[in-house]
Amino acid sequence: MRPRLALSLLLLSVCAISPAASQSILPPTASGDMIFDAWASDFQGRALAAGIAPEVLAREMAGLTPDPRVAGADSRQPEFSKPISDYLKGVVTPDRLAIGQRRRADVAAFPDIETRFGVPRDVLLGVWALESGFGSIQGDYDTLRSLATLAAQGRRRDWAEGEIIATLKIIQSGEQPRSRLRGSWAGAMGQTQFIPS
């Protein structure tokens, strides 16, 4: 075989198995937002390289659009936009303290959590109280959409993409469907508002 032909065949075979080449088999997003669509197209190769199956990626990215409610929300977080004393006055209230004291005594799962995970109940109670008001405010944002919006904005791209990949792995494993992955605008979910990773 001629060296030039052999080199051409080798290059074609390498391109056929590379993440960048795999990316082109996925349908592009068409949100109407050029920045978001460019990010989504670029991200697909990284998701495939991280082990996300092409069919999962194509299904979950199909029809994905930026969430206008998320845009700019990270600059308005009360814990970062208020003086700490004002923030604490709003979250450490007599009602919340009373609920915490009742929950501390009532929740039967605390001994198991403390033993299995090494998390003291008072730490868990504090997180539970501050993050979701003991589960009363968990958010209803589509976690994948929120994280994709943050990634496309660029300021927190690396962090958000890591969380998107973690979200896609949860979906891919069958642990939870995307419809159950709901939470805050920042991608935090559940009663303790933990992020996907």
Give the role of each language-model region.
Residues 8-16:
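Bacterial N-terminal signal peptides
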